[in-house]
UniProtKB/Swiss-Prot annotation:
This is Xylose import ATP-binding protein XylG. CDD domains: ABC_Carb_Monos_I, ABC_Carb_Monos_II. It is a peripheral membrane protein. It is found in: Cell inner membrane.
Length: 511
């Protein structure tokens, strides 16, 4: 019997002659968690698609051994039957089906040729209880539950398939801190029961906490596999990016000028409960060249606030917005962009990209009028602009005409940034600009933010990562329960002070 539950040997994969994977090795023991680390586009997800059968045997080179025997899977059904289950970053849920129906999708219990819903609900409830998940009603549609709860339902679905190896791709990217803790504790329990795990995350503190071994890949090549006990987070970062990063936040001096943008008495109401305010009488000013961070707990109203300023909040709103001292009316994103206000949305996949369109066209769609003459697009001029943006933002793509959905999350995010920078905004709103982005891409995005500030662009940034808010902001607004709880200059500002303001403890305001 092999020492390893899984061995991937010398795995290679090409797309249109471009090597995505080149000689990758990965080994996992039963009861072991292997952290798989690498920058966006390094090949992590491609490797997991090979392992999980998304790319069937014969479409890649190398060998996979499972429980000591070579595995030649022709699809996902084969790998799941063997006990290899992947949980994708984008959850594979059918929102209007019940929790139980999602857990048993494709393997529904039947009686007399009909689905036995009583048996299915009972087995689903029993499964969740076994996983110590006691606050989910299996008869309710999945859309009733938060992203964190849906992640747990996906895990229950995997356990129902008798998973021996669980592949988790960025499982906490959209979870709250408490939901993340529940998930990590659950994975630790699985390890004690002998289940193996491959954990892919850009949150290296999570990797360090639950991984026994770390494998790093870069540009499709295997860089190192080492016990986590021998590594520090800076060690992993250095192996990922190929260079030492002494300062993740490359602060650069920039001048802060006069007030550029002002929001007065902004209030927004919940879409599903029109009597409930989600933003309650918030006012603030933003100066030319200033980076203003917005901090707060998940659900505090930060995204609702910035969405209303860009004209995309679907519920009722009221208040006044001023740009360069003049009141402006913003009812739609078109109004905002015409006034010089652009926004990078929180949900890149849903609101930021057109997935089947090329990378380049996703960048230039905001400024097509620049390349239009008598109703026709000057494709040569557009291509010059696309190539310039790809170089400026270091977007990794084999061809600007590839569908943007084929790019890694970090490179998609850079394309979204480009789309919102091309109109030359006076005010740039960034809602979770580095969510799902690796440490190297984060560094490049931070440098870009500072470069824009030096050019006089006013930046309003929402982030759930406190070190990020404190690392790049000139000033920090704190939102709690829809209200402005603090306005602090970022001078000796601590996470503790920001958190105290967010949860409503006394804090001194300083504009």
């Amino acid at each position: 019997m092999s020492e390893y539950l899984l061995e991937m040997r010398n795995i290679g994969k090409e797309f249109n002659g471009v090597k995505a994977l080149d000689g990758i090795y990965l080994k996992v023991r039963a009861g072991e968690c292997v952290g798989l680390c690498g920058e966006n586009g390094a090949g992590k997800y491609t490797l997991m698609k090979v392992l999980s059968g998304v790319y069937p045997h014969g479409t890649w080179t190398g060998e996979i051994f499972w429980e000591g025997k070579e595995l030649k899977a022709s699809g996902i059904r084969d790998t799941e039957a063997a006990g290899i289950v992947i949980i994708h970053q984008e959850l594979m849920m059918v929102p209007h089906l019940s929790v139980a129906e999602n857990i048993f999708l494709g393997c529904e219990p039947t009686t007399g040729g009909f689905i036995d819903y009583d048996q299915m609900n009972a087995r689903a409830a029993e499964l969740l209880a076994r996983l110590k998940i006691n606050d989910i009603n299996v008869a309710l549609p999945v859309y009733h539950y938060s992203g964190g709860k849906q992640q747990l339902i996906e895990i229950a679905k995997a356990i129902n398939k008798n998973a021996k190896l669980l592949i988790l791709d960025e499982p906490t990217s959209a979870l709250t801190a408490s939901e993340t803790r529940v998930l990590i504790d659950l994975i630790k329990d699985f390890k004690k029961q002998g289940m193996a795990c491959v954990y892919i995350s850009h949150k290296l503190d999570e990797v360090a906490e639950i991984s026994d071994t770390v494998t790093v890949i870069r540009d499709g090549a295997h860089i190192a596999t080492r016990p986590m006990s021998e590594l520090t987070t800076p060690d992993i970062i250095t192996m990922m990016v190929g260079r030492e990063m002494k300062n993740l936040f490359p602060r650069e001096p920039h001048d802060i000028g006069e007030v550029m943008f002002e929001a007065r008495n902004i209030s927004c109401w919940d879409v599903t409960n029109p009597d409930r305010k989600v933003v309650d009488d918030v006012s603030f000013a933003l100066r030319r060249g200033e980076i203003l961070g917005i901090a707060g707990l998940v659900g505090a109203g930060r995204t609702e606030l910035v969405s209303s300023l860009f004209g995309v909040w679907p519920g009722a709103c009221q208040g006044q917005v001023f740009l360069e001292g003049k009141e402006i009316k913003i009812r739609t994103p078109r109004d905002a962009v015409r006034q010089g206000i652009c926004m990078v949305p929180e949900d890149r996949k849903r609101d930021g990209i057109l997935p089947i369109m090329p990378v380049g066209h996703n960048m230039t769609i905001s400024v097509l009028d620049r390349f239009s003459l008598r109703g026709l697009i000057d494709k040569d001029a557009e291509l010059v602009a696309i190539q310039r943006e790809i170089l400026r933002l270091k977007v990794k793509t084999a061809d600007p005409m590839l569908a943007i959905a084929s790019l890694s999350g970090g490179n998609q995010q850079k394309a979204v940034l480009s789309k919102m920078m091309l109109p030359d905004p006076k005010v740039l709103i960034l809602d979770e600009p580095t969510r799902g982005v690796d440490v190297g891409a984060k560094y490049e995005i931070y440098k870009l933010i500072f470069a824009l500030a030096r050019q006089g662009v006013s930046i309003l940034m929402v982030s759930s990562e406190m070190p990020e808010v404190l690392g790049i902001s000139d000033r920090v607004l704190v939102i709690g329960e829809g209200k402005l709880r603090g306005d602090f200059p970022n001078e000796n500002l601590t996470q503790e002070k920001v958190l105290a303001a967010a949860i409503g403890k006394p804090a001194t305001n300083a504009a």
